[in-house]
From Swiss-Prot:
Protein name in the entry: Desmoglein-1
Residues cleaved off as propeptide: 24-49
GO molecular function: calcium ion binding; gamma-catenin binding
GO cellular component, as recorded: cytoplasm; desmosome; nucleus; plasma membrane
InterPro entries: Cadherin-domain_protein, Cadherin-like_dom, Cadherin-like_sf, Cadherin_CS, Cadherin_Y-type_LIR, Catenin-bd_sf, Desmosomal_cadherin
Residue ranges constituting the Cadherin domain according to the UniProt record: 50-158, 159-270, 271-385, 386-498
Keywords (A to Z) from UniProt: Calcium, Cell adhesion, Cell junction, Cell membrane, Cleavage on pair of basic residues, Cytoplasm, Glycoprotein, Membrane, Metal-binding, Nucleus, Repeat, Signal, Transmembrane, Transmembrane helix
Xref: SUPFAM superfamilies: Cadherin-like (SSF49313)
GO BP terms: cell-cell adhesion; homophilic cell adhesion via plasma membrane adhesion molecules
Function: Component of intercellular desmosome junctions. Involved in the interaction of plaque proteins and intermediate filaments mediating cell-cell adhesion.
């Protein structure tokens, strides 16, 4: 590099800069004066114009008007024209308004009010110079006015109370929390500089915390914080501005510091040594309570203790369970102690916490042992089997009474075999073993057969009971016999595919038919070889699995999938729900049809349980002809259908693998169906019962029931008597037709009147009435006389010993009559429907073949009805006198009283020509006399009503009084008295001079007879003598009458 040239260039540059800064731009102009001929040179110098005067600062909170003008602006344009000055901005034309004003001519700016720096730290005034036309002569100028700060705001903490926490035993100078405070005065100024100071500490034993003067950080002063001494500290902190000066402003806050617990206390047991005692061979769940003391925070992991064994519990006889709520340990005995083996134990216990110890005391912890002395008390012990289970081996060469070994109980106190016990077999499958009660020698009862081998699955497991009668104690030992290597031969196949064992017992197949072998698998596969004579070699060899999936199986699978593809096509061709007459279709099922199949799956009524109980296939006891018994009387069933469980009452052990059922609660052998002799099924016996019914017995039973019903139906006579039907809906109000009015005559049910007596029973069943049995044609029926015995007057009769029938309300009852003639048949006239419905009606029906009708029948009934008097269907022989004018009807002043006379048939003798009935104006008593039949001779009787029956609502009907010859009877009917005027109605003898009269207190006559020209009056009445005498009292429900 050429340093001389570089230095020369730098010097020249510096010289030009200095020259430019310190020199003025001047222009000299020559002025020639023509008067005196002289020349003057004027020097013109360019100067920067003075446009503003810098504004003075304003102090907040003071009157700054003494400093006016705080600024002055001026434009050079004012030299040659008029200039107007204007200002704008915050404090002028923006809030706060009117703080600054300007003199438009001189440009002086004045302040007019007190300012607040915290509200407006500074003002920006926009100045403009305008000409007379309002145009800017200069570019607008910004004038800044600064507001000086004063210390008028104290420090403010962000929270009134600060909360912090720190662990005990923390190191010195550990940060606890940081306080935050602010000052609204000017930042980075002494007025806003805050200094912090701790002015108070609670508890005030010794200062534990320090605070940073400038940052507000609170730290620990030392490492002596101890939660067990003080769990919380409270500090009062002051913050002062002006760096804590005396002239500064200050504020205070609270600081709460929680001391957290650490595991710095070693737990220890309340008692250093303890002594206890316990009897041998006993267990105790609360042998000793051990309390642990720990000074750490309760219910925390630092406080919860764990007690452990240091020594003395090598046999695991004891356990310790801790209570976390009380920190108390419970010493338990979980394994019996033996006095003969040890009579004293020394336990050494240690304790620690669940949580690890704090590092501050880790080096100080030393394990301290607590001694527990346990004394074992001696007791008189019984005998026990040692060992608890014993195994023997039995082969096919061992025969009956073969001694396979002995299993004796051991006397623990004497340490020798017990001599005071007796032995019995407990659980003994297939009754295989026997034991000597004194010597405990175990022998075989019989030679082990192949059936027993299969039942046991190759392994026998039973129990032996050792009973000490003196001490009343029993112990149990288990016997296990391995039969796998006993040398039993396998089965060989027969010609028909079944297998025959070496002992000649045939079983259907190659399975064990319901009995598991060892692990519970019920199927055993045999490999059967043949010798030169075609007989199996008897080698027991499981077959190897050589089954594989060949082409034929694949073809069958493909064919199955193809058949499934035809299902949619078949469904399309199926005529499901077709139109009527178009082939098979869905049959409509009526609603509310219960059908004849009942819940017990037998058509018709439920059969007698005692009869059907014999139809099930009985289970036969187990004998040697089919299966050897394998359960003794100590076995108890514990399940139903399909479980494989059996319990032993003596030893409390349970053995699985037996297929037992709860069908008959049998103990001593499995259930065997007679249809499967000699076999035992693998599954539950429920399939055997449900699938193996004795069909011959069931067929015979149902045939006998069908024949009995047929014979009973044929033995009943034809029912050809006059039937009375109540037309349903009679007396309905006129407006009750409703929406069914358009049906018209389609619902005419008059054809039911000609159906005959065959449909009476169907009608009774439909109405829910009790169907009366038809009389048998056998003259011996009924077996005894049922002639009614009428009670004396003033009492209420009972019907046939049956309890009284409670009245029902809100229903309509149809009264049907049945009379069985002994002579020629009766012509059936067309019945006339009653214009009135029956309500609150009591009907007394009587049948007799000879003798005189008992005159005294008294009925007390409190039912109510309308004011109706009905004399209805009085029937006598055809030779009666003219009935015209017989009855007279009074003037019905009360419209509610209705008198109806209907179907009166005259007998051979004349009836009285008049029927006098007084005016029943205030009476509501209704008396109906109905169908009194007398073929030849007269009936002398009367129907009287007590005169006290006025204003009552009792309806009494005397119905179907049938007489063969010379019946004289009366029926006296009494109702509850109601008060008012009333009377009685007396019924005289009808037919031979009988008549009907009444004295109810008035006089009125009926001079005409309704329906005298009915066609059935001329019909000849045959003998209507029934075959028996019956009496019935029926109470009917309430029906409204048409008045």
């Amino acid at each position: 590099m050429n340093w001389p040239f570089f230095r020369a260039a730098v010097v020249l540059f510096i010289f030009l800069v200095v020259l430019e800064v310190n020199s003025d731009f001047r222009i000299q102009v020559r002025d020639y004066n023509t008067k005196n001929g002289t020349i003057k040179w004027h020097s013109l110098r360019r100067q920067k114009r003075e446009w503003i005067k810098f504004a003075a600062a304003c102090r907040e909170g003071e009157d700054n008007s003494k400093r006016n003008p705080i600024a002055k602006i001026h434009s050079d344009c004012a030299a040659n024209q008029q200039v107007t000055y204007r200002i704008s901005g915050v404090g002028i034309d923006q809030p706060p308004y009117g703080i600054f004003v300007i003199n438009q001519k001189t440009g002086e700016i004045n302040i007019t009010s007190i300012v607040d720096r915290e509200v407006t730290p500074f003002f920006i005034i926009y100045c403009r110079a305008l000409n007379s036309l309002g145009q800017d002569l200069e570019k607008p100028l910004e004038l800044r006015v600064r507001v000086l700060d004063i210390n008028d705001n104290p420090p403010v903490f962000s929270m009134s109370t600060f909360v912090g926490e720190i662990e005990e035993n923390s190191n010195a100078n550990t940060l606890v929390m940081v306080l935050n405070a602010t000052d609204a005065d000017e930042p980075n100024n002494l007025n806003s500089k805050i200094a912090f100071k701790i002015i108070r500490q609670e508890p005030s034993d010794s200062p534990m915390f320090i605070i940073n003067r400038y940052t507000g950080e609170i730290r620990t002063m030392n490492n002596f914080l101890d939660r067990e001494q003080y769990g919380q500290y409270s500090l009062a902190v002051r913050g002062s501005d002006r760096d804590g000066g005396a002239d500064g402003m200050s504020a205070e806050c609270e600081c709460n510091i929680k001391i957290l617990d650490v595991n710095d206390n070693i737990p220890y047991m309340e008692l250093p040594t303890q002594s206890i005692s316990i009897e041998e061979n006993s267990l105790n769940s609360n042998l000793l309570q051990i309390r642990v003391i720990d000074l750490d925070e309760e219910f925390s992991a630092n406080w919860m203790a764990v007690i452990f064994f240091i020594s003395g519990n090598e046999g695991n006889w004891f356990e310790i369970e801790m209570n976390e709520r009380t920190n108390v340990g419970t010493l338990k005995v979980v394994k019996p102690l033996d006095f003969e083996a040890m009579n004293n134990l020394q336990l050494s216990l240690g304790v620690r916490n669940k949580a690890e110890f704090h590092q501050s005391i880790m080096s100080q912890y030393k394990l301290t042992a607590t001694a527990i002395s346990v004394t074992v008390l001696n007791v008189v012990e019984g005998s026990v089997f040692r060992p608890g289970s014993k195994t023997f081996v039995v082969n096919s060469n061992m025969g009956q009474n073969y001694k396979i070994g002995e299993y004796v109980a051991w006397d623990l106190d004497a340490n020798r075999p017990s001599t005071t016990v007796r032995y019995v077999m407990g659980r003994n499958p297939t009754d295989l073993l026997a034991i000597d009660s004194k010597t405990a020698i175990i022998t075989l009862r019989n030679k082990v057969t192949m059936e027993q081998y299969k039942i046991l699955g190759g392994k026998y497991q039973g129990t032996i009971l050792s009973i000490d009668d003196a001490l009343q104690r029993t112990c149990t030992g288990t016997i296990v016999i391995n039969l796998e290597n006993g040398g039993w031969k396998t089965e060989r196949p027969n010609v028909n595919g079944s297998t025959t064992s070496a002992y000649g017992l045939t079983s259907g197949g190659v399975t064990t038919n319901g009995y598991t072998t060892g692990g519970g698998v019920g199927t055993v596969t045999f490999a059967v070889g043949t010798n030169g004579y075609g007989v199996g070699t008897g080698v027991y060899q499981p077959l190897r699995d050589n089954v594989h999936f060949g082409p034929a199986g694949i073809g069958l699978l493909i064919m199955g999938f193809l058949v499934l593809g035809l299902v949619p096509f078949l469904l399309m061709c199926c005529d499901c729900g077709g139109a009527p007459g178009g082939g098979a279709a869905f049959e409509p099922v009526p609603e509310c049809s219960d059908g004849a199949i009942h819940s017990w799956a037998v058509e018709g009524a439920q059969a007698d349980p005692g009869v059907l109980a014999n139809s099930a296939v009985p289970c036969i006891p187990v004998t040697n002809a089919n299966v050897i018994e394998y359960v003794d009387n100590s076995g108890v069933y514990t399940n139903e259908y399909g479980a494989r469980e059996m319990q032993d009452l003596g030893g409390g052990e349970r053995t699985t693998g037996f297929e037992l059922t709860d069908g008959v609660k049998m103990s001593g052998g499995p259930e065997i169906c007679q249809e499967y002799p000699g076999t035992l099924r693998r599954n539950s016996m429920r399939e055997c019962r449900e699938g193996g019914l004795n069909m011959n017995f069931m067929e015979s039973y149902f045939c006998q029931k069908a024949y009995a019903y047929a014979d009973e139906d044929e033995g009943r006579p034809s029912n050809d008597c006059l039937l009375i039907y109540d037309i349903e809906g009679a007396g309905s109000p006129a407006g009750s037709v409703g929406c069914c009015s358009f049906i018209g005559e389609d619902l005419d049910d008059s054809f039911l009147d000609t159906l005959g007596p065959k449909f009476k029973k169907l009608a009774d069943i439909s109405l829910g009435k009790d169907v009366e049995p038809f009389p048998d044609s056998d003259p011996s029926w009924p077996p005894k006389s049922t002639e009614p015995v009428c009670p004396p007057q003033g009492t209420e009769p009972t019907g046939g010993g049956h309890p009284p029938i409670s009245p029902r309300f809100g229903t309509t009852t149809v009264i049907s009559e049945n009379t069985y003639p002994s002579g020629p048949g009766v012509q059936h006239p067309t019945p006339i429907p009653d214009p009135l419905g029956y309500g609150n009606v009591t009907v007394t029906e009587s049948y007799t073949s000879s003798g005189t009708l008992k005159p005294s029948v008294h009925i007390h009934d409190n039912r109510h009805a309308s004011n109706v008097v009905v004399t209805e269907r009085v029937v006598g022989p055809i030779s009666g006198a003219d009935l015209q004018g017989m009855l007279e009807m009074p003037d019905l002043r009360d419209g509610s009283n209705v008198i109806v006379t209907e179907r009166v048939i005259a007998p051979s003798s004349s009836l009285p020509t008049t029927l006098t009935i007084p005016d029943p104006r205030q009476s509501s008593n209704v008396v109906v006399t109905e169908r009194v039949i007398q073929p030849t001779s007269g009936i002398v009787g009367n129907l009287s009503m007590h005169p006290e029956l006025s204003n009552t609502h009792n309806v009494i009907v005397t119905e179907r009084v049938v007489s063969g010859s010379g019946i004289t009877g009366s029926s006296s009917l009494l109702g509850s008295a109601g008060g008012g005027s009333g009377g009685g109605i007396g019924l005289g003898s009808l037919g031979g001079g009988g008549g009907l009269s009444s004295s109810l207190g008035g006089a009125a006559t009926i001079g005409h007879l309704r329906g005298s020209a009915e066609h059935h009056f001329s019909n000849t009445l045959g003998s209507a003598s029934p075959t028996t005498t019956r009496s019935r009292i029926t109470k009917y429900s309430t029906v409204q009458y048409t008045k």
